[in-house]
Amino acid sequence: MAKEQSGTKEHSPMMRQYLEVKERYPDYLLLFRVGDFYETFFDDAITVSTALNIVLTKRTADIPMAGFPYHASEGYIAKLIKKGYKVAVCDQVEDPADAKGIVRREITDIVTPGVTYSDKLLDDRHNNYLAGVAFLKEGKTLMAGVAFIDVTTAEFRITTLLPEELPHFLAGLHPSEILFSTQEKERTLLLKKSLPSETLISLLEPWMFSEEQSQTVLLRHFKTHSLKGFGIETAGGNRAALVAAGVILQYLEETRQNSLSYITRIGELHHTEFMSLDQQTKRNLEIISSMQDGSLSGSLLQVMDRTRNPMGARLLRRWLQRPLKKLTNIQERHNAVEELVENRTLRESVAEQLAAINDLERSLARIATLRTIPREVRQLGISLAAIPTLQALLSDVTAPRLQALTAALQPLPKLAEQIESAIDPDAGATMRDGGYIRAGYNEELDDLRSIASTAKDRLMQIQQEEREATAISSLKVSYNKVFGYYIEISRANSDKVPAYYEKKQTLVNAERYTIPALKEYEEKILHAEEKSLLLEAELFRNLCQQIATEAATVQANAALLAELDALCSFAECAVAFDYTKPTMHEGTTLSITAGRHPVLERLLGAEESYIPNDCHFDDKQTMLIITGPNMAGKSSYLRQIGLIVLLAQAGSFVPAESASLGVVDRIFTRVGASDNLTSGESTFLVEMNEAANILNNATERSLLLLDEIGRGTSTFDGMSIAWSMCEYIVHTIGAKTLFATHYHELAELEERLKGVVNYNATVVETAERVIFLRKIVRGATDNSYGIEVAKMAGMPNDVISRAREILAGLEKRDVEIPRQKAPKVNTMQISLFEETDNQLRNAVEAVDVNRLTPLEALLELQKLQEMARSGGY
């Protein structure tokens, strides 16, 4: 701002006004209304010109300027927000004709990535979150408190995490904007590396993060003495999270979001209620987006989303990312889906009603903040009027969850009737010309309209009288905004114009006049129309405010309708795709018969059927080692099992003939890897970081899906790590594990470790080619068919032939991976050395494997190798 403020006294009055406003909003692009344009100046102009690719001009020799028409502002603002900027809109708040001196201007709106109501910015099937993060000590432990809100739906939640859990949580939440204290600059720089590049970090003053300040703001907003009524205990470890929630409300007030009364609830996100899915798992299972291009196409969500309105779509998205962990809650959803599956008439009738209901959550937010149009208000009334019909359809349901949903719905018949009587069915997309309040709703408005209408009839009468008086048959009475009402006469008839006609305008082929009688009725019409427009706007505001007083009830109905929509979506998928109801239990066993990959079977289409596969885990079978070549279906099989478990715990039926599943607390995946160049991490280090996360956090109730562990390093190093991980999982964790590998030597673990069982992806060899059957069967295989895969990929024949020669030579070598000599495995580490090598034995025994990360284990192994090469000394 220094550059902009220099020489302020030399600027024009308007520019001084601009600089005064800009000084109050230094972090925002200031859009300054000048006539029919929004203008930006100085550095803002340079930024806006570049971001929007519009012309950069100059107001004076030293003031850069860029702008765009006010009527197109929503689209331009949307582009700026998508690029991560914050925008302050400064409008003219008085008519320039009435201004004494410079026109008065005020900030009328502030838009940021996390605070926007614009349809041009929002995806109606996604939430748009604003998050706040605060750090406080609970006892001796530093905790990260997170609050997040979607201002367009009024969803407002808090949660408390350890600082190291924060990156994964925020990456999963995917907020558009995050609020931090300026005291946390270093922490935010580190955190940014794990967030999408478009996420905006807004740094606020530290005083906003005080406990006392936040508590005052929260209690004032919710008009309560405590938050216990929302199930939140201030002393229950939520101190940091409540600070973050208070910061969010302060930020919304600071950004002039004054109509916040529609935000009626705040709740705690209880992690114990949901299966934990880290970002790697969400990405690897392609739950929300495809790994190939990040789009919805090819994702689980694309397959499962048959919702009929945006509220249900947003909830279904959350369900798939937060599967349930409590058995009774899972079974409640399954039973509800089952009834909808079995009762086709009910399912189709409910779906039809849901399709007629608009987005109550976002409509309410726009109505409460007076950002709406009459047509949207009318649609909300129609949606409310549909609730009794839905209740009647659901009156005989037997599933407990459907019964609870039906009973909890609260029709608002009086409000629906008032909206119906107030808003004209033909109300347009704008309010500028009036006519959107229905006739009969307000007596004063009807009278004003009658005056205007009667006066217009009198104008037509004047037109006829003047035609007769002047004998000019083409004379006509017309209107425009500049000259008002006038009489237009062609030049050819100018000699017939009476003396009492007062000229108003001369055109090429006509003259325009007025007369006393026309002036009299013009005043009556314009006065009545002006008052009518003002009264209509007032009536509409009052109606919006009345709707806002019912915000809590409308939001409760919206949540119930969204849940019903998501359950119907699950039911429609179950019917369309031949899914089955899984049997859920509290045990750790898992049994899937003829399971299918929910996404791949849809992509294959009718011309190619998906090959189903079984999967079984119990006390005798806890780890499945799956060998076989690439393209044989190992990775797809791993993902298939993960997706079936996830769908079951989200409340859906599953793609299988039958499924009996113990509730899983977490799903971990280690499938594929790539360099993390921004953090300076190699493929192998990324792989080891992910593997370490699994080993440190998995429990007996977890499901581990591990694909090609150790392939990022040399063969022997990689195999050693894979072997050691298998031992650790079996002996220390006991989690259900699918372990796909090219290391055929790992098949030996079946004989050495209890619970390890070999499976392989079947292949049929013919004289000319290899056929991948994509069937997972019992037993191991010792052939990777890598050369055959290379041939299928189109490698030159010379390369293929030479590869066969090299492979034949390598297979003749007497190369063996060191194996344990002891008949029984009692240790957690592979025995690589003979009994006589005492020094090596002592060195190995001194290693505390329980404290080593996989990477440290690799380094320790390298030291032991060097010792072995030097003869153990």
UniProtKB/Swiss-Prot annotation:
Which is a GO BP term held by this UniProt record?
mismatch repair
Looking at the UniProt entry, the stretches that span the membrane are: none
InterPro entries, alphabetized: DNA_mismatch_repair_MutS, DNA_mismatch_repair_MutS-lik_N, DNA_mismatch_repair_MutS/MSH, DNA_mismatch_repair_MutS_C, DNA_mismatch_repair_MutS_clamp, DNA_mismatch_repair_MutS_core, DNA_mismatch_repair_MutS_N, DNA_mismatch_repair_MutS_sf
What keywords are assigned to this protein? ATP-binding, DNA damage, DNA repair, DNA-binding, Nucleotide-binding
Superkingdom: Bacteria
Listed GO CC annotations = cytosol
Q: Which residues bind ATP?
A: 628-635
**Molecular function GO terms recorded:** ATP binding; ATP-dependent DNA damage sensor activity; damaged DNA binding; mismatched DNA binding
NCBIfam families, alphabetized:
mutS1 (TIGR01070), PRK05399.1 (NF003810)
What protein family is recorded?
Belongs to the DNA mismatch repair MutS family.
> What HAMAP family does the record tag this protein with?
MutS
Q: What does this protein do?
A: This protein is involved in the repair of mismatches in DNA. It is possible that it carries out the mismatch recognition step. This protein has a weak ATPase activity.
Protein name in UniProt: DNA mismatch repair protein MutS
Query: Highest lineage ranks of the organism?
Result: Bacteria, Pseudomonadati, Chlorobiota, Chlorobiia, Chlorobiales
